[in-house]
Amino acid sequence: MAREQTEVRELDEGSYVMIEDTPCKINSYSTAKPGKHGSAKARIDAKGVFDGKKRSLSQPVDAKVWVPIVNRKQGQVVSTDGNDAQVMDLDTYDTFTMRVPEDIDLQPDDEIEYLQYEEQRKITRS
């Protein structure tokens, strides 16, 4: 699995964290100390990278959480078919099919940037 373990206090807004076994990008991060003898707690609000669902996590700041290793890669569109595009990775020359977001218009030979975590991929910009 492409993930590593880290403490909650080392996370920042914009970084990635695993919530409910889903890679999520952190939208907001806040800490609060509950009292004189209590340990600080962190509240994280995040959005799923591949499914877009909002999730939250509340943990002590010294708790360990999994951080996914999400790779940003370059690809070239080979062909398009409705909402799907056949993309070739520019580093490994692997070819695979990806779902095209509605707000992106792709043509063959366009170069794109996409995120990849294990077997999940998402086009971020063209």
Curated annotation (Swiss-Prot):
Coiled coil: none annotated. It is found in: Cytoplasm. It comes from the Archaea. SUPFAM superfamilies: Nucleic acid-binding proteins, Translation proteins SH3-like domain. One of its GO terms (cellular component) is cytoplasm. The modification Hypusine is found at K36. Keywords: Cytoplasm, Hypusine, Initiation factor, Protein biosynthesis. One of its GO terms (biological process) is positive regulation of translational termination. The keyword 4Fe-4S does not apply. Belongs to the eIF-5A family. HAMAP family: eIF_5A. This is Translation initiation factor 5A. It comes from Haloarcula marismortui (strain ATCC 43049 / DSM 3752 / JCM 8966 / VKM B-1809). The gene is eif5a.
